[in-house]
């Protein structure tokens, strides 16, 4: 029941009105609805170990429905255009797209998605958010656009909660209300659909008409697609909300900030955003799998991630007199080499680990040896129990090398570090746990993908990805992740 509920909900939803969404097209270009050319979509279904009020059978049913809905919605992204009615200024060349939000009977289909205008809306939303990206905790455009779109489709103010984790948004569609379903005694069976919203500090060099208008910031990881897809799912759910109500079930929409290193999910979880839910479905994109395939993996799928910052202090001098310095640049070079040897020389080869340096900063003049150099990076582990030994080796090695060069070094674990966004609002950085997939749910996802798209569309992988999936929801549940290249 729950399964049906959730998956169904994803694909269809009710209100009794039309939704106008701004849509951007290149002149003379039509939206190729069947041509899907984007990154893989990771569907992560997570189940709480203690499923009160639910039998395992009910849980599997819910997951089945959720998976079916997500797989269908996946087809929409990557074809798209620009935008919704939100406060930020949108790029030029935008037209309105009408979405039929009238209640719809029966299980949703791809035909419904396209004929209702939802596909065009998702395309427009995705391109709009691509053109107006925001880095972690600065996702104001995506956040405000999501809220505006939810309101337009008929989600009441009482069922939308904003400002969670600075820019995070949580909304409710189905039986009960957002407030009532967050209570422990709620009888409404609720599932969470999650999308991340943040972009990366990367300069976009494409020539697409919806390229980033924010200098040095780009949606290079597909989170614009995730957010647009979640809004598309919301439209379907609203069209079929009466079915959810009849089943005493609901879907919670979880728009997460700061997946890229800021652990925005934790801020929402701490605010109670997933209280009362029994499962969560998450999407991610990646261009590595063949178009038209779904990649699955059992067990550990994504690594845990910890970030560190190093401050190396020495004594500056003129470039012509290096003997008068305690050169922090020379020390930094040796430290980077030493760090890169930690994995190959101190960790058992069968234990997957990656330590990478992401930045080095020091000096301002070509002829002056600086007093200080900073550098930082990430530690990625499939087995979190290795962290203490890796951290100890890292800190001791950095301190020893710095001392050998006459310098000192401070190594900072950034877990719990505070920061401010562009509007002066405070946020906190946290480490990410690994993602571990539940075999039973993975098998269910494979079954659904095969049923919907045919034999040969599921690629069962066995090599974990050392990238992390920044959602703190994961350590609370069993997990399921599927990659889909339909996007």
PLM ranges: what are they?
Residues 75-92:
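N-terminal signal peptide
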Residues 87-219, 228-249:
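Acidic/His- and Gly-rich active-site-bordering loop/insert found
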Residues 126, 133, 150, 154-155, ...:
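Structural signal for hydrophobic packing residues in well-ordered secondary-structure cores
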Residues 169, 199-202, 206-218, 224-225, ...:
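Histidine/acidic-residue-rich, glycine-tolerant segments that coordinate divalent metal ions
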């Amino acid at each position: 029941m729950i399964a049906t509920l959730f998956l169904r909900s994803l694909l269809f939803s009710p209100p009794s009105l039309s939704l106008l969404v701004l849509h951007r097209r290149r002149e003379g270009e039509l939206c190729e609805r069947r041509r899907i050319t984007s990154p893989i979509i990771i569907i992560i279904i997570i189940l709480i170990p203690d499923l009160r009020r639910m039998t395992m059978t009910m849980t599997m049913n819910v997951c089945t429905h959720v998976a079916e809905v997500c797989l269908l919605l996946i087809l929409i992204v990557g074809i798209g255009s620009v935008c919704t009615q939100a406060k930020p200024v949108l790029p030029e060349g935008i037209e309105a797209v009408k979405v039929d939000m009238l209640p719809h009977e029966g299980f949703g289909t791809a035909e419904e998605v396209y004929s209702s205008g939802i596909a065009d809306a998702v395309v427009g939303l995705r391109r709009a958010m691509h053109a107006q990206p925001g880095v972690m905790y600065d996702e104001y455009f995506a956040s405000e656009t999501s809220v505006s779109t939810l309101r337009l489709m008929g989600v009441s103010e009482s069922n939308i909660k904003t400002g969670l984790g600075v820019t995070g948004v949580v909304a409710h569609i189905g039986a009960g209300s957002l407030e009532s379903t967050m209570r422990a005694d709620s009888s409404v069976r609720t599932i969470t659909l999650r999308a991340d919203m943040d972009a990366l500090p990367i300069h976009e060099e494409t020539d697409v008409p919806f390229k980033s208008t924010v200098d040095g910031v780009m949606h290079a990881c597909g989170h614009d697609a995730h957010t647009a897809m979640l809004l598309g799912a919301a439209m379907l759910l609203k069209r079929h909300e009466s079915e959810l109500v009849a089943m005493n079930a609901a879907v919670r929409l979880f728009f997460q900030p700061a997946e890229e290193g800021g652990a925005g999910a934790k801020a929402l979880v701490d605010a109670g955003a997933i209280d009362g839910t029994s499962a969560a479905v998450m999407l991610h994109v990646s261009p590595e799998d063949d178009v038209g395939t779904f990649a699955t993996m059992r067990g550990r799928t994504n690594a845990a991630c910890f970030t560190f910052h190093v401050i190396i202090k020495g004594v500056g001098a003129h470039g012509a007199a290096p003997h008068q310095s305690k050169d922090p640049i020379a020390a930094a070079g040796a430290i980077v080499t030493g760090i890169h040897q930690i994995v190959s020389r101190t960790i058992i080869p069968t234990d997957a680990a990656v330590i990478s340096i992401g930045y080095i900063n020091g000096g301002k003049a070509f002829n002056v040896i600086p007093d200080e150099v900073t550098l930082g990076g990430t530690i990625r582990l499939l087995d979190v129990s290795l962290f203490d030994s890796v951290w100890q080796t890292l800190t001791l090695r950095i301190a020893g090398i710095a001392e050998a060069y006459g310098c000192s070094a401070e190594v900072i674990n950034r877990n719990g570090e505070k920061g401010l966004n562009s509007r002066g609002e405070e946020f906190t950085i946290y480490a990410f746990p690994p993602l571990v997939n539940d075999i039973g749910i993975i098998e269910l996802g494979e079954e659904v993908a095969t049923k919907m798209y045919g034999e040969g569309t599921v690629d069962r992988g066995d090599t974990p990805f050392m990238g992390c999936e920044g959602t703190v929801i994961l350590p609370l549940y069993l997990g399921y992740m599927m990659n889909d290249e339909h996007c």
